[in-house]
């Protein structure tokens, strides 16, 4: 069984999974795009929602902007780091209970980029990867990837747009590279490509040599109720009377 652990900036840990726990509930919402289809250029934030108990005589130790490190811990005490999340302003739901919503480091990339762009037109054109590095520097986000999967040297000409965010720069770079952007467990930005991890299985008898295979779980079927076929008419063209068979 796994338990949730939230580590606060001061090192305090809130633990769940047992009677009297400070961390009453925690839900992780994770996605790389908005739907079921592959979407390049996505730059989604994962986020957590936590219900935290606080002593009525004390105060909640979390404030807006705090970095919360989320771990999953098993019965043996082994921990897996899930991610780093930045808290929104906590909401008091009961006398001694608070709801905390926190978004991963991708949310920091919502910082403005237009101001820098307006003041730095002269150095263009720039490689798109350099633009990614500048956007991350502006937002205070570390990079896990050392380059884009492809097209990292694509030359970007001078441009300007109002209300442009660092996240939009990241999204454009991901689109140019045919990939998506996501944060790793250490809160660092990475550019990833979609990989098909489904297994394949041949549908021929054992021992038969056939290169045609299908992806497991990729086939589906449906049952339909149809009227009985009473007559078949064969025609060579729309104007042909044809031959009928009953």
Report residues per predicted region.
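Extracellular, surface-exposed passenger/stalk and repeat segments of large secreted bacterial proteins
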Residues: 87, 102-104, 154-159, 200-207, ...
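Acidic, small/polar-enriched beta strand-loop surface segments
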Residues: 1-19, 171, 175, 180-246
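Surface-exposed or flexible loop/turn and strand-edge residues in extracellular/cell-surface modules
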Residues: 45-47, 65, 82, 216, ...
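A generic structural signal for beta-strand entry/edge sites
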Residues: 45-49, 94-99, 186-188
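Surface-exposed cap/loop segments at beta↔alpha junctions
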Residues: 2, 54-142
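Extracellular/virion structural assembly segments
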Residues: 29-65
């Amino acid at each position: 069984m796994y338990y949730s652990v939230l580590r606060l900036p001061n090192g305090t840990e809130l633990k769940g999974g047992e009677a009297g726990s400070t961390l009453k509930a925690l839900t992780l919402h994770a996605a790389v795009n908005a739907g079921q289809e592959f979407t390049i250029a996505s730059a989604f934030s994962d986020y957590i929602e936590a219900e935290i108990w606080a002593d009525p005589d004390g105060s909640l130790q979390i404030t807006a902007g705090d970095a919360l490190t989320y771990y999953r811990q098993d019965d043996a005490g082994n921990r897996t780091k899930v991610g780093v999340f930045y808290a929104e302003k906590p909401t008091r739901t009961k006398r001694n209970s608070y709801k905390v919503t926190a978004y991963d480091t991708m949310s920091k990339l919502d910082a403005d980029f237009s101001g820098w762009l307006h003041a730095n037109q002269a150095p263009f054109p720039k490689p798109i990867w350099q633009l990614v590095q500048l956007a991350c520097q502006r937002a205070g986000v570390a990079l896990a990837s050392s380059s884009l999967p492809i097209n990292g040297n694509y030359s970007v000409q001078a441009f300007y747009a109002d209300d442009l965010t660092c996240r939009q720069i990241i999204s454009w770079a991901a689109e140019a590279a045919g990939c998506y952007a996501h944060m790793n467990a250490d809160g660092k930005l990475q550019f990833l490509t979609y990989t098909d991890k489904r297994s394949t299985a041949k549908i021929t008898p054992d021992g038969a040599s056939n290169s045609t295979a299908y992806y497991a779980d990729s086939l589906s079927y449906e049952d339909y109720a149809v009227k009985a076929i009473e007559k078949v008419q064969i025609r060579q063209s729309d104007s042909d009377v044809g031959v009928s068979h009953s």
